[in-house]
């Protein structure tokens, strides 16, 4: 992969009041600041993973140092912290800014389109007559099922990417997320320090976080419609994939740490994280007592904060149980 500026890196330039010269700086994710030359500044500013560095000999001499100073990625496999790794599928180049109007249009249409497709698909499934007759031994086409499921996970992240570009986020890449060697989903990486817009409204943040859920709802509707129109041999597979998309939408809507629902709710309330706010209010003895002194309102807030923590526990247990089942089935299949 061509060099890509890391998501936690920021670039800046300052005009020296004494000399009148412009000085260029780069700061990495661990807050180390380096002064760099103008040519390197411009090369890093344009390092989006889609082309070589705009330096002599494509910057081959300086790339090892830039990697060592935690300024660029050159491998598709990146360490995201702890046991988490990402595999970059799609570097999002800077040229997407040229068609930002298209992304704005798609983002504006997505909430309504997702609802209309889902209502249409659900109506057809509940009240329509299936086209054709199911075969006697109806079964799921495994390869198609997994292909559509992985596409649905990727589509969720493309929804975030679309909203991010529309609102002026510096979207870097779309990739697959791993814990160790186990794939657990997909992700979109953004460099908020280098975003083209500095202040985002609550409405923009909420839509950014909900756009992935909306994409899955729309996908579920499309699959339900397709199961009605296409060959009945495919119907069960398409319906099962629609169910997966509905499950993804519901799961991501929950207010658990790291999920879109928690981030959207936090943006709505104007705080960094409702999960950590719940922890602070319930685990801090003085805050907890202060809440309970406010009568019904205080008890309601305590119950709300408690439900956030319970949701977090249930989501973790659900994910772990699914991986236990997956490992068990894999071992059983092998042996």
Please report, for each region that a protein language model flagged, where it lies by residue.
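Long, low-complexity, charged/polar intrinsically disordered regions in eukaryotic proteins
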Residues: 1-28
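Topogenic membrane-insertion module of multi-pass membrane proteins
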Residues: 73-154
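Small-residue-rich helix-interface/hinge motifs
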Residues: 79-83, 142-195, 267-269, 273
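Helix-boundary and loop/linker segments of multi-pass membrane transporters
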Residues: 133-139, 192-200, 237-240, 294
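Hydrophobic transmembrane alpha-helical segments that form the core helix bundle
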Residues: 200-334
């Amino acid at each position: 992969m061509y060099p890509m500026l890391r998501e936690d890196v920021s670039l800046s330039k300052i005009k020296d009041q004494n000399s009148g010269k412009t000085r260029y700086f780069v700061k990495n994710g661990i807050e180390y600041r380096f002064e760099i030359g103008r040519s390197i500044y411009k090369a890093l500013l344009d390092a989006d993973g889609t082309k070589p560095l705009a330096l002599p000999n494509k910057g081959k001499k300086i790339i090892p140092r830039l990697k060592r100073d935690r300024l660029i990625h050159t491998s598709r496999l990146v360490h995201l912290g702890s046991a988490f790794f990402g595999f970059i599928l799609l570097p999002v180049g800077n040229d997407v800014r040229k068609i930002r109007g298209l992304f704005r249009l798609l983002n504006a249409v997505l909430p309504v389109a997702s609802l209309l497709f889902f209502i249409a698909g659900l109506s057809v499934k509940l009240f329509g007559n299936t086209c054709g007759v199911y075969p006697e031994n109806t079964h799921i086409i495994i390869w198609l099922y997994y292909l559509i499921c992985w596409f649905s996970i990727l589509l969720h992240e493309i929804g975030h990417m679309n909203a991010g570009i529309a609102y002026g986020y510096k979207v870097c890449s779309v990739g697959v997320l791993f814990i160790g060697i186990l794939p657990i989903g997909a992700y979109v990486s953004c460099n908020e320090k280098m975003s083209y817009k500095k202040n985002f409204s609550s409405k923009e943040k909420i839509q950014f976080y909900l756009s992935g859920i909306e994409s899955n709802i729309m996908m579920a509707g499309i699959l339900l419609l397709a199961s009605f129109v296409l060959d009945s041999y495919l119907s069960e597979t398409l319906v099962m994939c629609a169910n997966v998309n509905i499950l993804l939408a519901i799961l991501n809507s929950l207010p658990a740490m790291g999920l879109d629902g928690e981030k959207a709710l936090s943006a709505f309330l104007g705080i960094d994280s409702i999960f950590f706010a719940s922890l602070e209010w319930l685990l801090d003895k003085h805050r907890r007592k202060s809440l309970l002194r406010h009568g019904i309102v205080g008890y309601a807030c305590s119950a709300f904060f408690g439900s956030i923590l319970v949701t977090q526990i249930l989501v973790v247990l659900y994910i772990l149980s699914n991986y236990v089942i997956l490992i068990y089935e894999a071992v059983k299949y092998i042996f």
